[in-house]
Amino acid sequence: MKKLLSIWLLSAVLLLCACSQRPKTVETPAEEPKVEVCDTLGVVNADTPTEARLRAMGLVDISEMDSSIAVHLVYATPYNFLGKQLYHDLTKAFMLPELAEKVLNAQQALKKIRPDLNLLIYDASRPVSVQYEMWNMVKGTSMMPYVSNPNRGHGMHNYGAAVDVTLMDCTGRPLPMGSEYDYFGVEANTNNEQQLLAEGRITKRELENRLLLRKVMTGAGLHIIQSEWWHFNLTSSETERKKLQLIDF
């Protein structure tokens, strides 16, 4: 009996020792969510003949000033509302230096608010020859009101004084804005957005994205137009427009 008691006591002591040596579980605080910072590195390519002519006019390539601003010229592809490639040797976003400075300021303002976003440029300088080609394609169609008639005057793109732009996340995906780029319908308008929201034509998130884009672009001194949420002009003054040099080739 004494022998059994001794064995039981020894087992109990060993069990207590083992428990005391077991490592304690330490709870680590949850890691704070990281804010994704979006940066891109542009690849510098030699100018094509068209790009060289634009540069010779004093226009600047925005990517050389800030490579984090993404550029995808829609008219350099056939994936546009006309279904035809119109820029055959133009893939860089050239613009007047004054416009470029304002776009840079808009990008910097955007990064302060949303480090995970960048500006994405769809169009900038447009030679007059391309404008004629666009006009001839829409003449006599329902798309006529949405394309500037070069026989009656020229749009700001033809001076390097306008930019079509949206917001892009770090995966390269454009943020939803309630309509596609170059969509010709009321959903693209900027003067009736609260009504569009109330009617369910655009969502709250899409409106918030538009307002953020507009905040940084107009905050940099650029001007919107009522029919296109993506379009921003250097100036709204006809007097100032007449001082600009036409991209007449």
How would you describe each model-predicted region?
Residues L16-A18:
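C-terminal motif of bacterial Sec signal peptides marking the signal peptidase cleavage site
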Residues S20-A124, N136-M137, T141-S227, S236-F249:
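Extracytoplasmic cell-surface/polysaccharide-interacting catalytic and binding patches
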Residues P127:
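Segments that shape or occlude catalytic/ligand-binding pockets
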